[in-house]
């Protein structure tokens, strides 16, 4: 068995469909967006889109249509999934709670039938008499719409026209009538049929039109008064209604294929059209009024409005605003203007919605050396191509920033006694102090009476009896608030300089070298109570009051130089309660007593970024439970702040971190800032609930996210990225990309638009000694699109394209790796290519090119001709492992800097994927699943260990551990194969057993080992082993991790219980949705826990939680089973959410 947990780290972002209507109420205008398995419901308001609800469907949404049957006050939603579940949904709201009610449901899959190549089509008769589905060739499926039917039942009508391209119901027909484009050996034709519900048959339709354009691909049914249909082709747009026929062939639409359309006006006089290049057109139907008052179509006109993201779907909302749903780039809200701008465009983007899809490749890197992976993806395609940098952390939203270098500390003040909010910020520098007045959002420098400005401040704040305090290197100064004047000052008796200080509302402790002085704050008086001498100099101290001690701290925490110790002293006597030797050479720089979730802690940060934390007993001053984490490489300063009414600690360093507690465990979360030296909380009128943060050069005021989430940065390339790798020595990424160029009259090609490879700082072009013939142009015609492939070298800090290297004509770059080879000290970028010609079934030649990038130059070090396409390449024990068409080949790197073949393995159809671990190689084949090879270094050859004999068409593979291998295949499933080392016969040993099966519902393009969260920080009790991330076509990022058997069984039990409690939208069974499903077989899911379902436990109500845990047996780590409580499971699930 294999025990795995699969969970979503980023939900799918690519938009597959969108509709608009009145779903939430008759008055609301709604936009509904489908992102694969997720349905998002928005209300269209004057301010933009307001999200109402997000629904996770147990299925890939294939069809989504709003309709309003007679007698309904608002629209209902029809959904069909890829596994042929159908449902009719209704929106119900009572108070705050929103429900999506399933009015009717069913499954319309046929036992036999060939799924149509042109995909699933679902249409609804305008009079809401029936739903029509085209799922299989030669069949038209009808679901009659009766109001009372809870179960949706369908019947098939045979369709002689096997190859239907598109079909729609016509408007204004007595009987439901379909109009469709179909193809036969003679070409493409348009035909209509009436659908008879009684006979369950087709009757002859009102009209037909033979031999329309050969590329006719879309039918648009036109409402009355015109009626009829518009047929859209590659070059022409035609209108038919039986007695009228109109055709136009505007040259403007010829450049690209129209892929989506949407009606603007209810009467069908205007339509939006979107094409593959992201151009947006308006199709206008001009009317002519006849003498008898009827309206006929006079003319068709097409106008280019401008450019948008490449649209998968369009929907017109209101007031000239259009939603552009994109699968290949970010989706947009655009405004259509009456007048064009300077570029001649009528389209203005108002808002963009991030889309990571399609994720074609990705790599995990720790760029800032922060012990936390960032994911860099190759996302999008064509002009929407980009790199996306994704990291998990707590975001800071900047509201103001001031250039102020050299800040050594900062504190908020309420200078006016009658204020609830801060109005002043005090900044400390070496040898001086400056005061900033906050007036609304304005910030100006000012002076405070009673404060000194020519010394460095160690502490400043509001204290008891309406007073302010300023502790500088020279003295402790007490200042009255009203009027502002110095009322008391304390200096060290020999006038020595204060080195560190800590203060709360009524107590002060200062250190002068080894001496400690304890003062109390009284009205207009600082009273020295006691002092003591330590054996070493004091490096840091803290007297934060904990518990309910009336704001007084009975304890003082100090860190000492020389013996590197942390100590807890009793006030006022300075009696030593506890001494903790921290060990090592590095001095403590910051110490803090704090309370998280009513447990008291002592935190002590050293000068090298290490942080010790202990449990603190405030009665006895004893420390317990010592733990250590590393939070950076530089001295760390600890400050508390409050967020969501809980205490948090901000650790300022070169790797700023927020420390908080969850389930009585400390959690350390990255803050998405490069560096923070000092911070303080700030709550002023202009900047409520904010933080002030200082680095070496700048003061920033901002607000902080309440939760950790994924932050996405976009680097547009304007061309298609294919592969990415990271090279640490040159601090660069290598990216393979392709741009589209068009053949011109001279036989050359021209780029369609500027993009990353045409705008690089420097560039070079391949010239190969290997293929003399390849440079002779193959047959291409004028206006034909060709792909031009490049290797881009991209700076890891600025993401600037430093160099672009263009490959040969017709040469496709397929694989990329950065590695060292043999004993050669250099690190190389190595690219595998193929010469691709349309007349060849598969590539017959390609090359492996070895590049070195150093000092801003890219040099070709070696090239090797191969007889085929170099699909994947990986570094393998100092050698280069590549697969060329069906052969897996190992090259060694000679001292002459040449690649020499060492050994081959031939037993594949097309070896598309390679992963290695030690001497083992996992090969993923186009159609023959996975195979495990072992390299024998003594013999210098490959041995076939075992293979999976199931015919899986692979899309990605990964090695989980020595015995478990993860695969993704093209029917959206995941599986795990296991090597059976204990098998007794050779035959059994050669079989990889499928021990894990799961329907993911996503097409996985890439797996890679790595994590999006901080590694090894804090404590965790969830025994998850390893972390493999995956990226999909829909822009989803997921994670697979391995579990122990006992945890797997607990979560499986929990999953089954959750399925009884959580009602699925559309009444689709979870077990049906997750069952492994291909055209060959369907098997129940096994070996995988659905993490998304487990995490939904946190969102359900308390009574439902109780229902889930009833009689659930749980081992709390003591080895004994007991009945679980809801809180036990909340803890378990919260821990699991922290892995992504």
Swiss-Prot record:
The region called WD repeat beta-propeller C is annotated at 709-1043
Give the N6-acetyllysine positions (modified residues).
1067
- Disulfide bond annotation, renumbered to this chain: none
- Modification Phosphothreonine, positions: 1125
InterPro entries from the xrefs? Answer: Beta-prop_RSE1/DDB1/CPSF1_1st (IPR018846), Cleavage/polyA-sp_fac_asu_C (IPR004871), Quinoprotein_ADH-like_sf (IPR011047), RSE1/DDB1/CFT1/CPSF1 (IPR050358), WD40/YVTN_repeat-like_dom_sf (IPR015943)
Pathway terms, separated by semicolons: Protein modification; protein ubiquitination
| PTM note | Phosphorylated by ABL1. Ubiquitinated by CUL4A. Subsequently degraded by ubiquitin-dependent proteolysis.
Q: Where is this region: Interaction with CDT1?
A: 2-768
Task: List residues modified as N-acetylserine.
Answer: 2
Region of interest called WD repeat beta-propeller A, as start-end residue ranges on this chain: 13-356
Its quaternary structure? Component of the UV-DDB complex which includes DDB1 and DDB2; the heterodimer dimerizes to give rise to a heterotetramer when bound to damaged DNA. The UV-DDB complex interacts with monoubiquitinated histone H2A and binds to XPC via the DDB2 subunit. Component of numerous DCX (DDB1-CUL4-X-box) E3 ubiquitin-protein ligase complexes which consist of a core of DDB1, CUL4A or CUL4B and RBX1. DDB1 may recruit specific substrate targeting subunits to the DCX complex.
Protein family membership: Belongs to the DDB1 family.
What's the name of the protein? DNA damage-binding protein 1
- UniProt source species: Pongo abelii (Sumatran orangutan)
């Amino acid at each position: 068995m294999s025990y795995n947990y699969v969970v979503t780290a980023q939900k799918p972002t690519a938009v597959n469909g969108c509709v608009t209507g009145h779903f939430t109420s008759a008055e609301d205008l709604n936009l509904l967006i489908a992102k694969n398995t997720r349905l998002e419901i928005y209300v269209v308001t004057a301010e933009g889109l307001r999200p109402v609800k997000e629904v996770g469907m147990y299925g890939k949404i294939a069809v989504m249509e709003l309709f309003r049957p007679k007698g309904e006050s608002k629209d209902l939603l029809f959904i069909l999934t890829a596994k042929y579940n159908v449902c009719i949904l209704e929106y119900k709201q009572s108070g705050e709670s929103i429900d999506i009610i399933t009015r009717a449901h069913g499954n319309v899959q046929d036992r036999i039938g060939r799924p149509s190549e042109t995909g699933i089509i679902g249409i609804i008769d305008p009079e809401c008499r029936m739903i029509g589905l085209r799922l299989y060739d030669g069949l038209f499926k009808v679901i009659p719409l009766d109001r009372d039917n809870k179960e949706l039942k369908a019947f098939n009508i045979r369709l002689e026209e096997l190859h239907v391209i598109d079909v729609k119901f016509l408007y204004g027909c007595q009987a439901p009538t379909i109009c469709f484009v179909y193809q036969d050996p003679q070409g493409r034709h348009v035909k209509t049929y009436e659908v008879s519900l009684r006979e369950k048959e087709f009757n002859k339709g009102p009209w037909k039109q033979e031999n329309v354009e050969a590329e006719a691909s879309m039918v648009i049914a036109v409402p009355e008064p015109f009626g009829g249909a518009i047929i859209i082709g590659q070059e022409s747009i035609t209108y038919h209604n039986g007695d009228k026929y109109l055709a136009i062939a505007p040259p403007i639409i010829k450049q690209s294929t129209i892929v989506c359309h949407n009606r603007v006006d209810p009467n069908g006089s205007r339509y939006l059209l979107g094409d593959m290049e992201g151009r947006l057109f308006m199709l206008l139907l001009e009317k002519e009024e006849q003498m008898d008052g009827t309206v006929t179509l006079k003319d068709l006109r097409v106008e280019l409005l401008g450019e948008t993201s490449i649209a998968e779907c369009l929907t017109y909302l209101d007031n000239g605003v259009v939603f552009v749903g994109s699968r290949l780039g970010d989706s947009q809200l655009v405004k259509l203007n009456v007048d064009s701008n300077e570029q001649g465009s009528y389209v203005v983007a108002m808002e963009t919605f991030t889309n990571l899809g399609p994720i074609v490749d990705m790599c995990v890197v720790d760029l800032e050396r922060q012990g936390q992976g960032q994911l860099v993806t190759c996302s999008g395609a064509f002009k929407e191509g980009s790199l996306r940098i994704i990291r998990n952390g707590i975001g800071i939203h900047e509201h103001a920033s001031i250039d102020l270098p050299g800040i050594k500390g900062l504190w908020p003040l309420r200078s006016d006694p009658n204020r609830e909010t801060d109005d002043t910020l005090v900044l400390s520098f070496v040898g001086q102090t400056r005061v900033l007045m906050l007036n609304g959002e304005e910030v100006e420098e000012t002076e405070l009476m009673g404060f000194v400005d020519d010394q460095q401040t160690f502490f400043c704040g509001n204290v008891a009896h309406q007073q302010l305090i300023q502790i500088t290197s020279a003295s402790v100064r007490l200042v009255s608030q009203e009027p502002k004047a110095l009322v008391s000052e304390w200096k060290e008796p020999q006038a020595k300089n204060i080195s560190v200080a800590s203060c709360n509302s009524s107590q002060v402790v200062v250190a002068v070298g080894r001496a400690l002085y304890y003062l109390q704050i009284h009205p207009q008086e600082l009273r020295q109570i006691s002092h003591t001498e330590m054996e070493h100099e004091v490096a840091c101290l803290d007297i934060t009051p904990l518990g309910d001690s009336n704001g007084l701290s009975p304890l003082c925490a100090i860190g000492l130089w020389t013996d590197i110790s942390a100590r807890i002293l009793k006030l006022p006597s300075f009696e030593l309660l506890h001494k903790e030797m921290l060990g090592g050479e590095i001095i403590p720089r910051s110490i803090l007593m704090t309370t998280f979730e009513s447990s008291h802690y002592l935190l002590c940060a050293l000068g090298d970024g290490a942080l010790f934390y202990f449990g603190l007993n405030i009665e006895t001053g004893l420390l317990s439970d010592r733990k250590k984490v590393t939070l950076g490489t530089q001295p760390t300063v600890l400050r508390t702040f409050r967020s969501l009414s809980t205490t948090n600690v901000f650790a300022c360093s070169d790797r700023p971190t927020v420390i908080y507690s969850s389930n009585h465990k400390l959690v350390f979360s990255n803050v998405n800032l490069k560096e923070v030296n000092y911070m303080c909380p700030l709550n002023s009128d202009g900047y409520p609930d904010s933080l002030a943060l200082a680095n070496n050069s700048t003061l920033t005021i901002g607000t902080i996210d309440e939760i950790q989430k994924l932050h996405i940065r976009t680097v547009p390339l304007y061309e298609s990225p294919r592969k990415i790798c990271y090279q640490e020595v040159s601090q660069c990424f290598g990216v393979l990309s392709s741009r589209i160029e068009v053949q011109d009259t001279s036989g050359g090609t021209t780029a369609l638009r500027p993009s990353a490879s045409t705008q690089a700082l420097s560039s070079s072009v391949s010239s190969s000694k290997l293929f003399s013939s390849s440079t002779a142009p193959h047959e291409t015609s004028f206006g034909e699109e060709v792909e031009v492939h490049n290797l881009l070298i991209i700076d890891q800090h600025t993401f600037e394209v430093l160099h672009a290297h263009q490959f040969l004509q017709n040469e496709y770059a397929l694989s990329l790796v950065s590695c060292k080879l043999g004993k050669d000290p250099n690190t190389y970028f190595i690219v595998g290519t193929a010469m691709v010609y349309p007349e060849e079934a598969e590539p017959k030649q390609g090359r492996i090119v070895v590049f070195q990038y150093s000092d801003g130059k890219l040099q070709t070090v070696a090239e090797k001709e191969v007889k085929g396409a170099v699909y994947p390449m990986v570094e393998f024990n100092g050698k280069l492992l590549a697969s060329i068409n069906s052969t897996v080949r190992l090259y060694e790197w000679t001292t002459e800097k040449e690649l020499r073949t060492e050994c081959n393995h031939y037993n594949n159809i097309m070896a598309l994927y390679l992963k290695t671990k030690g001497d083992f190689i996992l090969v993923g084949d186009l159609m023959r699943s996975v195979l495990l090879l072992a390299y024998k270094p003594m013999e210098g050859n490959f041995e076939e260990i075992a293979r999976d004999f199931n015919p899986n068409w692979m899309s990605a593979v990964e090695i989980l551990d020595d015995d478990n291998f993860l695969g993704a295949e093209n029917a959206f499933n995941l599986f795990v194969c296991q090597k059976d080392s204990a098998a007794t016969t050779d035959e059994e040993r050669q079989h990889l057993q499928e021990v894990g099966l799961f329907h993911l519902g996503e097409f996985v393009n890439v797996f890679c080992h790595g994590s999006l969260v901080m590694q090894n920080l804090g404590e965790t009790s969830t025994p998850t082993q390893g972390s493999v991330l995956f990226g999909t076509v829909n822009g989803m990022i997921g994670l697979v991790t391995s579990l122990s058997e006992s945890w797997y069984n607990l979560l499986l039990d929990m999953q089954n219980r959750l399925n009884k409690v959580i009602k699925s939208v559309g009444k689709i069974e979870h077990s049906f949705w997750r069952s492994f499903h291909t055209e060959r077989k369907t098997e129940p899911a096994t070996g995988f826990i659905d993490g998304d379902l487990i995490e939904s436990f946190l969102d359900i109500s308390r009574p439902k939680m109780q229902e889930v845990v009833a009689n659930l047996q749980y081992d709390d780590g003591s080895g004994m089973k007991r009945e679980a409580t809801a809180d036990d499971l909340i803890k378990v699930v919260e821990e699991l959410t922290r892995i992504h």
